[in-house]
Regions:
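Generic long, charged, amphipathic alpha-helical segments
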Residues: 419-439, 547-602
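Short active-site loop/helix that positions an aromatic residue
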Residues: 76-89, 107, 250-256, 393-407
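A short acidic-Thr-Gly-centered motif at the start of a beta-strand
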Residues: 1-2, 60-64, 371-386, 592-596
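Conserved catalytic palm subdomain of right-hand nucleotidyl-transferase polymerases, strongest
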Residues: 5-6, 73, 97-99, 379-395
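Conserved "right-hand" nucleotidyltransferase catalytic core of DNA-directed polymerases
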Residues: 1-10, 14-16, 34-36, 119-121, ...
Length: 652
């Protein structure tokens, strides 16, 4: 198939970081400045659209030709930019595109062109140009009007012709680097199903989800009034110009509690409240707590990223978590929305929409908490539709039991599904009927289930058991009981550890159950999942760890520092990746199946799909059945879904 590689440089006064690509490309002054392209291995060409050049007919025809594959690094942006700036009746259908960034992510590489080039040790002429950031800042964003620049708000090519020529070289170089990455990774096949899943992901992101602008604006207004009132009260009590300033407030508090106050975090304030004798000091600390709780960032993110038709697009990044291939949240970060527990959610929502802020304060414990619980409800279906929400029930627990052949767990999932109760019964040798919701044993079963599936020990339980419901001295016994009750799972951890080490040491392939394989390929360890998809670990080695035993190392992105570095892994961690990746593949199957049945997915969160469906179409039972359909590559995996319908998004 003929390939057309593309990179565009654009201008818009909208900030892409806060608004996202879809809203950015809708900006009234959005335009493509430069269009670099190359067919197959031909030299890269540049079209200077900003200076009146036009795209050759061959390129225009190719953009609309389904037999020519278009590629780009982060193709979602190029698709959006071209659709917005040029007229194509069918837009830029994702099935005619491939994304080299996604290819890099599937190989365990970073998600930026610059870092991929470095990770692959490309020569300088195949690396992204270092001057790029400054050039983008100069030509692609509004500039500050100054006396020196004649009070202009935008830099055009004629304002610095030398920089402009360099910018053209930079744009061409991006195509060179993208092509070099694509060629280097082309020997590693992507399955057809993964290609189709990316295409569906693009359709879902293009589709977007509706938002309630009245609710969003009222939430922002309510927060502003509430925060201003708290700040005024704090000013009166302290006499400080800015009681929000930690430096000023620490000094003021220190003078009144008799010692230096070094921290004002949510963990340190309760201690200060306990020792405070003065009522004013107590109230100031309470105000500080309340001000810290007010977070309307997600409402603001919705407002900024909302497109002209009221929909937010681009909420999900395909393969954003590249150890597992799961999606990552973008813009509103739907993967970590606060839960709603208000019994009268509808009333609270209506009070906010109609601006009855005083009533909200009178009826509910806390305005920040109420606003937080209403965030989900700002997502709304189309006129005449309702949301259908369905998610896999305990999917990771089911997948790990299936892989490990832990029969008692499979029996639980094939029948009543009460895994917390069954786990406690198995661990403490009591009848399951004796364990009721809310009982101590059920709580222990639940915490053990959530903390111990991937090799977790005492530390994992302590971080999971926030309320300290289990005495510390009981924790080692709990770990032992769980592992004794799940011998096949603990065996599976170390079987995977041995398989990975054998594959690396002997440069071979180790086959396990259900088509799970550990495959050594020069420079890469692949874990092939039953679905056929492969997880990649770059430059794997067996090295001596800090405790003197052999450990598996590989190169990857360190999650907190975002640096490309050497990472360690071991059996239980590999099992976590395998299980979560398999659960993700199950979600992919459900996405294909619900779409085929006419249910339109607008976004998804972990193992849950949110579908925007006409009120006279479809049944929840059908959706649950679709989720529970046996998967050909996972024989015997017991899948089950729970679902509900709603007029706005919420947690049931």
């Amino acid at each position: 198939m003929k390939i057309l590689a593309i990179d565009v440089e654009t201008y818009s006064s909208i900030d892409i970081k806060t608004a996202g690509a879809y809203r950015y490309c809708e900006g009234p002054d959005f335009e493509i400045l430069l269009f670099a392209y190359a067919f197959d291995d031909e030299p890269v060409q540049i079209v200077d659209l900003a200076n009146g050049e036009t795209l050759p007919d061959e390129v225009i025809d190719s953009l609309d030709n389904p037999t020519i594959l278009k590629t780009a690094f982060n193709a979602n942006f190029e698709r959006n930019a071209i659709s917005s700036d040029m007229y194509f009746p069918n837009g830029m259908p994702p099935e005619q595109w491939e994304c080299t960034m996604i290819k890099a992510l599937t190989m365990g590489l970073p998600g930026s062109l610059d870092m991929v080039g470095k990770a692959l040790n490309f020569e300088e002429d195949k690396q992204k140009m270092k001057e790029g950031k400054a050039l983008i800042q100069y030509f692609c964003k509004p500039c500050k009007p100054t006396k020196t620049n004649g009070k202009r708000t935008r830099n055009l090519p004629e304002h610095d012709p030398e920089k402009w020529e360099l910018f053209k070289e930079y744009c061409k170089q991006d195509v060179e680097v993208e092509r070099a990455i694509r060629n280097k990774l082309s020997k590693f096949e992507t399955t057809d199903k993964e290609k189709r899943l990316w295409q569906l992901d693009q359709v879902i992101n293009d589709r977007g989800v509706g938002t309630d602008l009245i609710l969003i604006n009222k939430a922002i207004e309510c927060d502003l009034i509430f925060t201003e009132r708290l700040q005024n009260e704090a000013r009166e009590l302290t006499g400080l110009d800015n009681p929000n300033s930690p430096t000023q407030l620490k000094k003021w508090l220190g003078e009144r509690v008799g010692h230096e106050v070094t921290s004002l975090t949510k963990d340190s304030i309760p201690g200060l409240l306990e020792e405070a004798k003065d009522d004013n000091v107590k109230r100031v600390l309470e105000l500080r707590q309340l001000m810290a709780k007010t977070s309307i960032k997600k409402y603001e993110a919705m407002e900024k990223s909302r497109c002209e038709d009221g929909r937010v697009r681009g909420l999900l990044q395909f393969y954003g978590a590249n150890r597992t291939g799961r999606w990552a949240g973008r813009l509103v970060q739907v993967q970590n929305l606060p839960q709603n527990h208000l019994p009268d959610l509808d009333d609270a929502r209506n009070l906010l929409r109609t601006g009855q802020f005083d009533t909200i304060e009178f009826l509910y414990d806390s305005i920040p908490d109420t606003l937080s619980q209403l965030i989900r409800t700002a997502f709304i279906p189309r006129e005449g539709n309702r949301f259908m929400v369905a998610d896999f029930s305990a999917i990771e627990a089911r997948v790990i039991a299936w892989y490990a052949g832990e029969q008692w767990r499979l029996d639980v999932f094939a029948t009543h599904g009460k895994i917390y109760e069954a786990s406690a019964a198995q661990m403490f040798h009591v009848p399951i009927e004796s364990i009721k919701k809310g009982s101590d044993l059920r709580q222990k079963g639940k915490i053990a289930e959530l903390a111990l599936g991937y090799g977790g020990s005492v530390g994992a339980i302590m971080s999971m058991d926030k309320s300290k419901s289990i005495p510390e001295e009981e924790l080692p016994g709990l770990v032992k009981s769980w592992r004794n009750a799940n011998p096949n799972i603990t065996k599976f951890w170390w079987d995977c550890d041995k398989a990975a080490k054998k594959a690396i040491n002997e440069r071979t392939t180790v086959c396990m159950q259900y088509g799970l394989k550990f495959i050594y390929n020069p420079g890469v360890l692949f874990i092939q999942l039953p679905s056929g998809r492969k997880l990649a670990y770059i430059k794997p080695k067996i090295e001596v760890g800090k405790y003197g035993s052999d450990v598996i190392t590989y190169e990857g992105m360190e999650q907190t520092s975002k640096q490309w570095t050497t990472l360690e892994t071991y059996g239980p961690k590999l099992v976590e990746n395998i299980v979560q990746a398999t659960a993700r593949d199950c979600l992919g199957e459900a996405m294909f199946n619900v779409e085929e049945a006419g249910y339109k997915v607008v976004f998804h969160v972990h193992d849950e799909l949110i579908m925007d469906v006409p009120k006279d179409f479809g049944k929840l039972e059908e959706v649950n059945e679709i989720f529970g359909k046996p998967i050909s590559w996972a024989p015997g995996l017991p899948l089950k879904a729970d679902g509900y319908e709603c007029d706005y998004y919420m947690k049931d």
